[in-house]
Every structure is written in structure tokens, then in C-alpha cells.
């Protein structure tokens, strides 16, 4: 709502006029929509074709600029000082409670239901999530299956037509951590919608067209992976932190995917239903009535427990330099990698969260952004990324922390040197530390899920080992954390911690001799090391 208000203000639209405009939406009829489509979607259109390639680089001289004066970087204008004196209410965080906002029911072995009431209308949303690790499966391409799936008695078109007659939509997702299917429609058509879903789950049918499409998408994915700098960046970080457990390495090899037939795909769809099941629902059907409707889906008792993705961050024995060559890259991505102690209490998690906000993840207010971009114009982007454990039982494992920065290739080593020095000698500003703490609290306040997302939120929390909203304990810990504690955490665990380094870009333009100051061990990744 705030975003809509801001958009109206920016375009000079009166908010009341906007409200009056959207209030006419319920009066629209199907004929109105059809008439608009027939009027605008005619034979007069532009057709765009996309062609991959690269332009010849222009050689331009660096424009002159005046250095930024840094002696008053924390000075505030009179307006900002006056604004800070304005009284503002203190927000009390709102948390989700099982038994209050969210009702639960046990559906059977490894199957649970989470529901919440819909106070606004009679539209439901039902999500079934089967949780299991699906390594060595075609996880990058299976999600498209839901556009080609029918049953043994209903073709895809016939199945979709029956859903449409009920006013119900179906979508699905197939990923490394499991499979999910979401239904949305009218509460009075929930029962027939679930019957159709049951038929789909028990008697899935697809065709050769999907298999051909899936194989084509896999080939294109392999072809274009090396062209996407951000995809390479993520895959390299995963490989450094997770080794052979890196997400990109869990997909089915293309050579094996080529041999898949229709029966194999249907078998994978059925096998995905053997994971731990959580069902999330928002609507006006009572939990007990819904549990009864779901019996045909939950009667199979061969589901397995789920303990999350099992990995431990890799700790290099010596400071290591990780390299990935992208010969046609105009820019480079550089950064550091550090293994930090476990975040096995809310207090430790609060310390790391506040420090990370302050140093790398506080957007315009972070140390990295100010030092690398504001004051020196060295980078295009910068930030931090943490590899933490989500399941409570695994919180006793160390975490991995990266700094990252995108810069010009000829500035790569300068940028890396500056990041390294900032980690060793971090500038400390009490006001910015307070802002980092407030940002952590703002994230909790702003992340409270809407009613439709509350069942899924609590289902995930319970799955990860929590008995209540995990943000409740986090908020308490963040509020009780002091600047002195954050500084001590940095000095004890980060300031002198062993670091490794990475560079992604055109390695021919990198001075290998100068790199030796960061470490003697060099690991140079190839495409097959980070992508399958």
C-alpha cells in the first residue's frame, strides 16, 4: 500500500482518484475483458528478436573528477537534525502464535496441516509441500512439468478445463529441497478441487512433448550458463563454501537427462511425494473438515522424515586464492571468504546480524558501500553473503561469510586490497552501529507474514526445529545487544580470522605475481567444477 501511494505521488495522481478507479474493478464483466482484448490485441504489433553477441569495446579516457571531502562524511544537515527530533512511536514486534493465528492438525505419519482464517473473502490458498533432498534429479527443468501434466483419464487440456470450470488455479515447483503444489480458488469449490488434485497425484500422465522440451531447456541452460556473470558468481561462492555439496552440482548430468523417457518423468513425480508433507491453508474451511478432505492425499504412509540439506562449510587449510576465468568479461567480481564460529544461540546470531548490517549488508550505510563506492568510486556493487544453517539442530556448525564487489578488471586488486584492509581495520562509528541494530529490528517488523503466508511460515519454522515464531527470540536478543558487544565480536572473531580470496573475470588482465601477497595456494575453477 505504501509503494502504491508513493507511485501515485510520483506520477501526480491523487490517492482518492486511484481508489475510485480500482473500486470499479468488481463491476467488470467477461464481455468487457473480451472487448478490450479484441480491440487492442489485433494484427498491428511489433515483434522483437533477441540476438546474443557482444559489441566492440570503446576506448575512452577517464573523465576528471574532484575527490570527495571525507572530513564531514557523518555531518548532518540542519533539516536532518530537526527531523531526528520528531517524536516517533516505538513499534512492538508482532509474532505468529501456533494455536492463535495458526491452527495445526496432524494428518498422519510425517504429515501435518497448518491453517489460518481468511478475514477478507472466500478465496482459499492450499499448498502441499513434500520435503526431501532430490539430488541427482533434473531439478532445473522439472518445474515446467506442471504445464504439461494430466491424469490417466484426463489429458492436460481436459484437466485444465475442469480446474477452470471450478475457478481454481494450480501451480507447482520442483527443487532440490522437494516439491510443492499450490491450489487457489473459491472455498465452495475446495472439495472438487482436491479430488482433481488427488487424481493428478495418484495417476500422473505427461507426454513426449514435455520430455523434448525439458531436454532442450537443459541444453540451452548448459550453453548459456557461462554467459551469465551473476550465475557464475553464485556457483563459485557455493563451490568455495560447500564443496561437492554446492547446489549447482546436485542436478542430474545432461548426459543422463538425455536418456529420460515419459515413464521416468512420471516416476520422478510420484517419488517426490514420499517426502515429509506439510499442508498450508488460508481460507474459511474448518481445520478438521479440511483434514477429512485431504485423507485421500495423506493415506499413503511411506513418507520419510526430513532434516534439511546436510552440509558443512569448507575451511581452507591455508589462505587460498580461488579464480574463475571469464575471458570476455568487462568487469570482475572479487571478495574474501572467512569461516566464522557457529551461531548456536540467538545472542550470537544477533551479534553477527548487526555486524554484517554495519559492515556489508546495510546498503548505503554499510562500511563497504561508503568506502568502496561513495568515497572512491571503485565498485558498481558490493555486499556480503553468509552461509548459515537454518535447522536448529545444525546451528552448532561453523558458518561461511563472503564479501563481494563488482568492479572494473583493472581495479580488481585495488578493490580486493581495500576490502582486506577494512576487515583488518574496520572504521567504527557508534551512530552507524545503532542504525545497523535498528535495521535488524526493522527487518523483523517488516517480515511479519500476511495471513495467507502465516501457515507456511510456521510450517517451515516447526520443520526447522522451532516450537514458536523464531523471530521472537531473535528480536529479544537484538534489542539487548550493545555497540560494545558488536565491536568485541568483530575483534574476537573477524578482525584477525584467516581469509581466503576469490576473483571472477578476465584472468589475463590480473597480475598473478601481485596475487601472491594474499596466499600461495591457488585453485582455478573450470565450468565443470561449478556447474552440472
Regions found by a protein language model. Name each.
Residues 1-25, 46-51, 61, 120-147, ...:
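M16 family metallopeptidases and their MPP-like homologs
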Residues 8, 16-132, 136, 266, ...:
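Proteolytic maturation boundary segments
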Residues 199-208, 296-304, 376, 421-428, ...:
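A common structural junction motif
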Residues 257-260, 265:
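Alpha-helical scaffold elements lining the catalytic groove of polysaccharide deacetylases
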Amino acid at each position: 500500500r505504501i509503494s502504491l501511494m508513493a507511485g501515485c505521488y510520483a506520477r501526480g495522481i491523487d490517492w482518492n482518484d486511484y481508489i475510485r478507479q480500482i473500486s470499479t474493478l468488481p463491476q467488470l464483466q467477461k464481455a468487457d475483458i473480451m472487448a478490450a482484448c479484441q480491440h487492442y490485441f489485433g494484427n498491428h504489433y511489433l515483434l522483437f528478436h533477441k540476438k546474443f553477441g557482444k559489441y566492440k569495446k570503446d576506448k575512452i579516457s577517464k573523465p576528471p573528477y574532484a575527490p570527495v571531502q571525507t572530513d564531514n562524511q557523518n555531518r548532518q544537515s540542519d533539516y536532518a537534525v530537526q527531523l531526528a527530533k520528531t517524536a516517533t512511536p516505538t513499534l512492538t514486534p508482532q509474532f505468529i502464535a501456533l494455536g492463535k493465528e495458526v491452527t495445526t492438525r496432524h494428518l498422519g505419519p510425517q504429515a501435518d496441516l497448518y491453517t489460518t482464517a481468511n478475514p477478507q473473502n472466500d478465496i482459499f490458498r492450499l499448498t502441499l509441500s513434500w520435503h526431501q533432498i532430490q539430488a541427482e534429479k533434473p531439478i532445473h527443468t522439472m518445474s515446467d512439468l506442471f504445464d504439461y501434466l494430466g491424469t490417466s483419464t484426463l489429458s492436460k487440456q481436459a484437466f485444465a478445463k475442469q480446474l477452470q470450470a471450478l475457478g481454481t488455479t494450480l501451480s507447482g515447483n520442483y527443487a532440490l529441497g522437494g516439491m510443492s503444489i499450490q491450489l487457489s480458488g473459491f472455498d465452495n469449490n475446495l472439495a472438487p478441487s482436491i479430488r482433481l488434485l488427488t487424481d493428478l497425484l495418484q495417476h500422473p500422465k505427461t507426454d513426449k512433448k514435455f520430455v523434448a522440451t525439458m531436454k532442450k531447456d537443459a541444453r540451452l541452460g548448459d550453453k548459456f550458463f557461462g554467459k551469465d556473470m551473476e550465475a557464475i558468481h553464485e556457483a563459485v561462492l557455493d563451490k568455495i563454501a560447500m564443496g561437492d555439496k554446492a547446489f549447482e552440482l546436485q542436478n542430474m548430468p545432461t548426459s543422463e537427462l538425455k536418456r529420460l523417457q515419459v515413464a521416468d518423468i512420471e516416476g520422478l513425480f510420484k517419488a517426490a511425494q514420499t517426502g515429509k508433507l506439510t499442508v498450508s491453508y488460508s481460507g474459511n474451511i474448518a481445520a478438521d473438515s479440511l483434514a477429512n478432505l485431504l485423507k485421500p492425499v495423506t493415506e499413503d504412509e511411506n513418507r520419510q522424515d526430513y532434516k534439511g540439506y546436510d552440509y558443512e562449510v569448507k575451511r581452507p587449510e591455508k589462505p587460498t586464492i580461488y579464480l574463475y576465468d571469464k575471458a570476455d568479461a568487462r568487469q570482475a567480481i572479487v571478495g574474501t571468504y572467512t569461516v566464522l564460529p557457529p551461531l548456536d544461540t540467538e545472542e550470537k546470531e544477533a551479534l553477527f546480524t548487526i555486524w554484517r548490517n554495519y559492515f556489508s549488508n546495510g546498503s548505503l550505510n554499510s562500511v563497504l558501500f561508503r568506502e568502496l563506492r561513495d568515497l572512491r568510486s571503485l565498485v558498481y556493487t558490493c555486499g556480503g553473503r553468509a552461509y548459515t544453517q537454518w535447522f536448529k539442530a545444525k546451528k552448532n556448525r561453523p558458518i561461511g561469510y563472503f564479501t563481494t564487489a563488482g568492479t572494473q578488471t583493472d581495479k580488481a586488486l585495488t578493490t580486493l586490497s581495500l576490502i582486506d584492509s577494512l576487515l583488518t581495520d574496520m572504521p567504527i562509528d557508534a551512530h552507524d552501529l545503532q542504525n545497523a541494530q535498528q535495521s535488524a529490528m526493522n527487518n523483523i517488523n517488516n517480515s511479519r507474514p500476511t495471513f495467507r503466508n502465516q501457515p507456511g511460515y510456521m510450517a517451515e519454522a516447526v520443520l526447522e526445529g522451532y516450537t514458536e515464531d523464531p523471530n521472537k527470540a531473535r528480536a529479544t536478543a537484538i534489542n539487548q545487544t550493545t555497540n560494545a558487544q558488536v565491536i568485541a565480536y568483530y575483534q574476537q572473531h573477524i578482525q584477525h580470522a584467516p581469509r581466503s580470496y576469490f576473483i571472477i573475470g578476465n584472468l589475463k588482465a590480473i597480475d598473478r605475481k601481485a596475487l601472491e601477497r594474499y596466499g600461495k595456494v591457488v585453485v582455478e575453477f573450470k565450468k565443470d567444477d561449478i556447474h552440472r
